[in-house]
């Protein structure tokens, strides 16, 4: 008797476990017209579309098969009628679950694996397909399972985020120095003024000895360069001063302006005059000791038009050399 009671208790426990694992079939509310109300209340009817498993994570595949346990004796059934009712209810639920799968024409999903996930951008959003725990698996982009996921580095504050999910940390770095920059020129140290004036109280010094000799004549009052023009007894300490004075007698004007026909006897007078022209440039005038080639400006538009019409162009700029 004790073995039969233990068997019935075990059977009742199995029934309760199977009932808790199975799908619950709710009764549908009656339609407004009253038609089709009894069809949904039948125990063996197919469940509605809302009760069918969706494309999300699958639930239990099917109702597990009940263990084959010998039916209780009539005496035991009278002693425990609730066990008999539980067994009958479990049989009805098992048969109704199998009939629903056969009527719907869909094979139950295998509980060991997932089906192909539906892309989120095509069908429905991920929040409707799966809960928060499974949304990452369904909405993940199609990629190789062997390729490791590379986490993106956090973007620095203020740096623009690059397209594709990469951080813009590399953009915040300073610009690289140009590789083809011109090399720096060495600073030219000026030569020392070695020729100092020997007279007391005079601190002047010169690069050349000839310049020092000319300066010493200012202390001694010596004027070795005298003018040989008739009735002219002027004397000078420097030869260039004598040459400049001599032109006042001859009237020679060897310094001509490159922008106009004017001529001058002194180079400083020419420079002062040439600066008044708006198109003047220092390279237009050659002085003694200048090594650069003078720059010749292109002819003006008016001169080009006049030469094309047949008239001769204006006088070409002449370059002279100072003594």
Swiss-Prot record:
<dbReference type="GO" id="GO:1902070">
    <property type="term" value="P:positive regulation of sphingolipid mediated signaling pathway"/>
</dbReference>
<dbReference type="GO" id="GO:0000981">
    <property type="term" value="F:DNA-binding transcription factor activity, RNA polymerase II-specific"/>
</dbReference>
<keyword id="KW-0805">Transcription regulation</keyword>
<dbReference type="GO" id="GO:0005634">
    <property type="term" value="C:nucleus"/>
</dbReference>
<feature type="region of interest" description="Disordered">
    <location>
        <begin position="279"/>
        <end position="323"/>
    </location>
</feature>
<keyword id="KW-0479">Metal-binding</keyword>
<keyword id="KW-0804">Transcription</keyword>
<comment type="similarity">
    <text>Belongs to the Sp1 C2H2-type zinc-finger protein family.</text>
</comment>
<feature type="zinc finger region" description="C2H2-type 1">
    <location>
        <begin position="195"/>
        <end position="224"/>
    </location>
</feature>
<feature type="compositionally biased region" description="Low complexity">
    <location>
        <begin position="40"/>
        <end position="53"/>
    </location>
</feature>
<feature type="region of interest" description="Disordered">
    <location>
        <begin position="142"/>
        <end position="161"/>
    </location>
</feature>
<keyword id="KW-0862">Zinc</keyword>
<keyword id="KW-0677">Repeat</keyword>
<keyword id="KW-0863">Zinc-finger</keyword>
<protein>
    <recommendedName>
        <fullName>Krueppel-like factor 14</fullName>
    </recommendedName>
</protein>
<dbReference type="Pfam" id="PF00096">
    <property type="entry name" value="zf-C2H2"/>
</dbReference>
<dbReference type="GO" id="GO:0006357">
    <property type="term" value="P:regulation of transcription by RNA polymerase II"/>
</dbReference>
<feature type="region of interest" description="Disordered">
    <location>
        <begin position="166"/>
        <end position="195"/>
    </location>
</feature>
<feature type="compositionally biased region" description="Pro residues">
    <location>
        <begin position="54"/>
        <end position="73"/>
    </location>
</feature>
<dbReference type="GO" id="GO:0045944">
    <property type="term" value="P:positive regulation of transcription by RNA polymerase II"/>
</dbReference>
<dbReference type="GO" id="GO:0008270">
    <property type="term" value="F:zinc ion binding"/>
</dbReference>
<dbReference type="GO" id="GO:0003682">
    <property type="term" value="F:chromatin binding"/>
</dbReference>
<dbReference type="InterPro" id="IPR013087">
    <property type="entry name" value="Znf_C2H2_type"/>
</dbReference>
<feature type="region of interest" description="Disordered">
    <location>
        <begin position="94"/>
        <end position="116"/>
    </location>
</feature>
<dbReference type="InterPro" id="IPR036236">
    <property type="entry name" value="Znf_C2H2_sf"/>
</dbReference>
<feature type="zinc finger region" description="C2H2-type 3">
    <location>
        <begin position="255"/>
        <end position="282"/>
    </location>
</feature>
<feature type="region of interest" description="Disordered">
    <location>
        <begin position="27"/>
        <end position="80"/>
    </location>
</feature>
<feature type="compositionally biased region" description="Low complexity">
    <location>
        <begin position="94"/>
        <end position="106"/>
    </location>
</feature>
<feature type="compositionally biased region" description="Basic residues">
    <location>
        <begin position="184"/>
        <end position="195"/>
    </location>
</feature>
<dbReference type="GO" id="GO:1990837">
    <property type="term" value="F:sequence-specific double-stranded DNA binding"/>
</dbReference>
<feature type="zinc finger region" description="C2H2-type 2">
    <location>
        <begin position="225"/>
        <end position="254"/>
    </location>
</feature>
<keyword id="KW-0238">DNA-binding</keyword>
<dbReference type="GO" id="GO:0000785">
    <property type="term" value="C:chromatin"/>
</dbReference>
<dbReference type="GO" id="GO:0000978">
    <property type="term" value="F:RNA polymerase II cis-regulatory region sequence-specific DNA binding"/>
</dbReference>
<keyword id="KW-0539">Nucleus</keyword>
<dbReference type="GO" id="GO:0043565">
    <property type="term" value="F:sequence-specific DNA binding"/>
</dbReference>
